[in-house]
């Protein structure tokens, strides 16, 4: 059953330090909006994030598409913006290998994701070792709390992530209550009867477009929030097709928060 508890109530009882921090921040900013900023240059990334920062609780990156990436010029300014605007950082890496490999992918290489991303995500296809590997990597890299989202369902047409696959992914999530904070999913994932209170983040949310020619399918803000989504992930709806990110940031922030208030009120 979809929870009607407020983010503040849930932050008080969560075993995940990242969830607690995120829910507290969401209440403080009155925002459940995550900006997906898929651009190709550091300048574009930082400019967009600075404009959207006041309206979001999270920024979602695909850091490996930045053509001119460097830790000093890309990540350090991004971290400064996260402090300035009070948002968290989610690197959408979608890890999908054995535990030892993902540990090195998470901590090493050019990107050193574990050093700067508050949360990341992983597929369940390789089993629970992916969770163990990423958790070890986080613990060995930083004293800062880190969180993991499992990819239970996707928003793209023809996705294989549903049914039995989703159920198995939920089983993997249950192996670590502190590090695994929730799911990328299209619906409520259950677990409350076993003491889990997972954060559900949903991509493919739009107020205008219904999809694109590459298989993306959009659902409305009210629809996803009513079905259990806690954080709406919006990308091109904020800045694509010449849209003004400030105008759209305000618009999506308001729509997401109002939908959340409706859900909470329904349970009172």
From Swiss-Prot:
Which positions are catalytic residues? Answer: 94
One Pfam family linked to the record: OMPdecase
* Record bears the keyword Lyase: yes
What name goes with this protein? Orotidine 5'-phosphate decarboxylase
Annotated binding of substrate, by residue: 38, 60-62, 92-101, 218, 236
Which domain of life, per UniProt? Answer: Eukaryota
Q: Which gene encodes it?
A: URA3
Q: For this UniProt record, give its keywords in alphabetical order, as a comma-separated list.
A: Decarboxylase, Lyase, Pyrimidine biosynthesis
